[in-house]
A protein has these predicted regions:
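Conserved N-terminal structural module of periplasmic/extracytoplasmic solute-binding proteins
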Residues: 4-8, 20-111, 120-129, 175, ...
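Extracytoplasmic/periplasmic substrate-recognition and gating elements
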Residues: 60, 65, 69, 89-90, ...
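Short helix-initiation/N-cap motifs at beta->coil->alpha
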Residues: 74-83, 180-184, 263-277
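Hinge/lid segment of periplasmic solute-binding proteins
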Residues: 101-159, 184
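Short, solvent-exposed loop/beta-turn-alpha elements that line the ligand-binding surface or hinge
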Residues: 116-134, 218-245, 296-299, 311-320, ...
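C-terminal capping/gating helix-and-loop segments adjacent to ligand/active sites or protein-protein/ligand interfaces
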Residues: 144, 322-323, 359-371, 376, ...
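Extracytoplasmic/periplasmic solute-binding protein
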Residues: 144-154, 159, 184-235
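Glycine-centered hinge/linker elements that transmit conformational signals in sensory
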Residues: 187-189, 231-264
């Protein structure tokens, strides 16, 4: 597909050079560009991030191959999240943009071009079935079940527990925990060996408690719990026995001293970079972007391991339900350069530059043709990723009510540090929810 488009664009460019002075249409339904136009791409990365550096290399090759100039603007997370929608609403030229799959397909969904036909060849040749399913679902959730494709996945990730295999071996732990009881036993061995079992950063505490609650009551139950509204037939309150059980099992780990003594004060990225990466803590809850973020702090003897959040007794979901997500690239429905934008998507997300992204940014490959290109640091993630059959939203939906999310984060930190027991946690959350 890429070769066909490149050839077509080169032919158009040659023909244009022979008919200087002849009249031409100002635009076309196909979205092809006029001579001298630039493709404008707003990127979520900061310019010094490895992802941005690979993208710049892909753009350079794209410009050389096609003659199409690209104005790439690296906005960073804050710049993208605060500036993109106002710019799109004001009809500013932005042909291509990216961000996380739910934000693009949900919050910015009305600006997206339908890619169903344009991406058919791409999907069959390069598309990861799981990632495309997530992208389709993300759009459908906020558009009355419309499951047409409006974005192309890249930079996939999974959220769960990373662990230090070296420390597990030192503590005599022979198998990866798959249940809460097995995690309890592993933490006991780590503590006995003088090793901090689990650490976490403030940025991921809502994800921590969200996952934990979802194991007991499922994601719809979590959403119903925090919003106070029924979700897909589920209605759950903070008095629910399974919610109490979740709080009690979490508090039990705090009482046993399994959580880092710094968990009450850890500000991202202190837990991952100052405790886990140097080898002071054996387990950290984080996403698969961790090896890239922590690479400058990693102990020489750290051997990377990963396991999905464990199953709990009588829980609704087991450890095959996980938050697998990705960034996505999307084309502005008003773009006059849709074909060129899609071709740039191909350059970034497939073949050489997708593989380079796995090497430089230590991320999961996007192109199914690169399925053997997982970084060594993420080798243990692949089995857990492939075993996932139920796909959680970010934090298993526990951040669905902005009014109580700050209260939840603060009191999860208190619960994990032992400053609050299970009953106290439930009481505070009931009050925050107005129950």
């Amino acid at each position: 597909m890429k070769k066909k488009i490149v050839s077509a664009l080169l032919c158009v460019a040659m023909a244009a050079s022979l008919v200087v002075g002849c009249g031409s249409k100002s635009g076309s339904d196909s979205g092809s560009s006029k001579g001298g136009d630039k493709l404008v791409y707003w990127a979520m990365w900061s310019e010094d991030e490895p992802q941005a550096k690979v993208i710049k290399e892909a753009i350079s090759k794209y410009e050389k191959d096609t003659g199409v100039k690209v104005d790439v603007q690296f906005k960073g997370r804050t710049g993208q999240r605060e500036g993109l929608e106002p710019a799109l609403s004001a009809k500013q030229q932005i042909d291509l943009f990216d961000e996380d799959v739910n934000r693009v397909n949900g919050s910015w969904g009305k600006y997206l071009l339908d890619l169903e036909d344009m991406a058919k060849d791409y999907e069959s040749e390069h598309g990861n079935e799981t990632l495309f399913k997530i992208a389709l679902n993300a759009y459908g959730q906020t558009h009355d079940g419309d499951d047409t494709l409006h974005s192309i996945p890249y930079q996939p990730s999974i959220f769960g527990f990373f662990y230090n295999k070296t420390l597990f071996t030192k503590a005599g732990i022979e198998s990866v925990p798959t249940t809460w009881e097995e995690l309890d036993a592993a933490c006991a061995k780590l503590k006995e060996a003088g090793i901090t079992p689990i650490t976490a950063d403030d940025a991921y505490l809502t994800s921590f408690i969200g996952y934990h609650l979802a194991r007991y009551i499922g994601q719809d139950g979590v959403k119903a719990l925090v919003t106070g509204e029924e979700c897909n037939g589920e209605s759950v309150t903070w008095d629910d026995e399974k919610v109490k059980a979740a709080a009690e099992s979490f508090a039990d780990f705090a009482k046993k001293g399994y959580f880092s003594k710094n968990i009450a004060t850890n500000k991202y990225p202190a837990g991952q970079n100052q405790e886990f990466a140097p080898g002071d803590a054996a387990i950290v809850i984080c996403g698969s972007w961790l090896p890239n973020e922590a690479k400058d702090s990693v102990a020489e003897d750290l051997e990377w391991g990963y396991f999905n959040y464990p199953s709990v007794p009588d829980g609704k979901d087991d450890n095959t339900a996980n938050n697998i997500a990705n960034q996505v690239l999307a084309i502005n429905k008003d773009s006059k350069m849709a074909d060129e934008a899609f071709q740039l998507i191909e350059y970034i997300t497939t073949g050489e530059y997708d593989k380079k992204m796995t090497e430089d940014a230590l991320c999961i490959p996007t192109d199914k043709a690169n399925s053997d290109a997982w970084p060594t640091e993420l080798a243990g993630v692949k089995e857990a990723f492939d075993a996932t059959t139920t796909f959680y939203d970010w934090a298993a939906g526990v951040e669905s009510n902005n009014d109580i999310t700050p209260v939840l984060q603060e009191n999860t930190q208190k619960l994990a540090s032992g400053k609050l027991d299970a009953a106290g946690f439930i009481k505070v959350m009931k009050e925050a929810a107005g129950q």
